[in-house]
């Protein structure tokens, strides 16, 4: 979305697709190990692992100062009803780098239908609600872009 809109934030936004969460977190651990020397340059880790249902906001684990900044950013997401930023969040896959001090947050969604599809033969693209999917993408893109484009780093 950022690329399509021609947006270039001040900092790099890295998208990582994880593997093996349910069977040992090998993807998250391997990422941490491969990037251990540069984790101080990781400003924020954002995980989306609850499906792409209607988003409501994010849960954040980090300092209160950073939480206040993210809550201000969250107001940009009010029009699509995904701007509530609460304390406590992250995700299993980003857990290894969070334990090394990287602040983390997870996208919160209305997940009542999650287990209708999760790891079943019904978990196919045709089940996606395009509007909910687009709201998730927009929520993640806005949060990632604004944090990456701030003049100052998100405080730890």
What is each stretch, according to the model?
Residues 1-69:
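Acidic/histidine-rich catalytic neighborhood of metal-dependent amide-processing enzymes
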Residues 53-156:
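Active-site-adjacent substrate-binding region
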């Amino acid at each position: 979305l950022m690329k399509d809109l021609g947006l270039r934030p001040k900092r790099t936004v890295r998208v990582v697709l994880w593997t093996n969460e349910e069977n040992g977190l090998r993807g998250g651990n391997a990422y941490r190990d491969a990037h251990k020397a540069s984790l101080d340059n990781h400003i924020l880790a954002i995980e989306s692992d609850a499906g792409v249902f209607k988003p409501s906001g994010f849960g954040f684990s980090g300092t209160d100062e950073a939480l206040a900044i993210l809550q201000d950013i969250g107001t940009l997401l009010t029009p699509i009803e995904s701007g509530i930023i609460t304390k406590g969040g992250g995700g299993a896959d980003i857990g290894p780098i969070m334990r090394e001090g990287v602040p983390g947050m997870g996208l919160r969604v209305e997940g009542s239908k999650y287990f209708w599809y999760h790891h079943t033969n019904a978990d196919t693209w045709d089940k996606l609600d395009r509007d909910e999917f687009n709201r998730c993408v927009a929520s993640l893109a806005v949060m990632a872009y604004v944090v990456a484009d701030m003049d100052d780093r998100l405080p730890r």
